[in-house]
Design a protein with these regions (language model features):
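Conserved beta-strand/loop subsegment of P-loop NTPase cores
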Residues: 155-162
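Short active-site-proximal "capping" loops at secondary-structure junctions
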Residues: 51-53, 78-79
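ATP-dependent carboxylate-amine ligase catalytic core
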Residues: 24, 31-32, 37-40, 65-151, ...
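Short functional linear segments
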Residues: 1-49, 62, 66, 74, ...
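Hydrophobic positions on the alpha1 helix immediately C-terminal to the Walker A/P-loop
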Residues: 55-59
């Protein structure tokens, strides 16, 4: 499937790696080279924690859209395929849009983790859309998570943090 091919391309590309590396310098540099598209996003709602992020995000999305407003959404991990991660306001991202954005990221020649690449794909594809709210599922280690790029999020909601993640957390997280 196209989804598996894209995941393999990410996993096997020399600039991208699957490791976890909590450092925002790389992703900030890529975004700076791309004219800081994250700064065009307003009404960001970050959802942090271990368990329940997807449930909260989809509930918020439903309530907001039922009220006639538009949302974008970034979830992790995918439920069925890579496109599931990216809701652009009225539809999921297309494979063509993912590939086009991936080429743009590769041109920057900056090594990124796979999660950082996916985050940049989301940011680029929603930065010129006028969604009323942008819902972003973050990791439990939010302070160093690649989704922690927005200067003034509207809301930062925290759901349950399970015991297996507690050993990663520090006072400033």
């Amino acid at each position: 499937s196209q989804s598996i091919k894209l995941y393999n391309q990410l996993a096997n590309h020399k600039l991208f790696n699957k490791s976890i590396n909590f450092d925002l310098k790389r992703i900030k540099l890529v975004l700076k080279k791309l004219n800081n598209p994250e700064k065009r996003l307003t009404n960001v709602i970050n959802i942090l924690g271990s368990d329940g992020k997807y449930s909260l995000l989809t509930s918020l999305k439903f309530f907001i859209e039922a009220n006639g407003q538009t949302t974008s959404a970034y979830i992790s991990p995918s439920l069925k395929n890579i496109k599931d991660r990216f809701w652009l306001g009225n539809r999921y991202i297309t494979y063509k849009e993912i590939k086009k954005t991936l080429k743009l990221i590769i041109k920057q020649k900056i090594p990124l983790t796979t999660f950082e690449v996916l985050t940049v794909i989301y940011i680029i594809n929603i930065s010129n859309r006028n969604n009323n709210y942008n819902l972003i599922e973050a990791g439990a280690l939010f302070a160093k998570d690649s989704t922690n790029l927005f200067s003034f999020p509207l809301i930062q909601a925290v759901v349950n943090i399970n015991k297996q993640h507690l050993n990663f957390l520090r006072k400033k997280t």
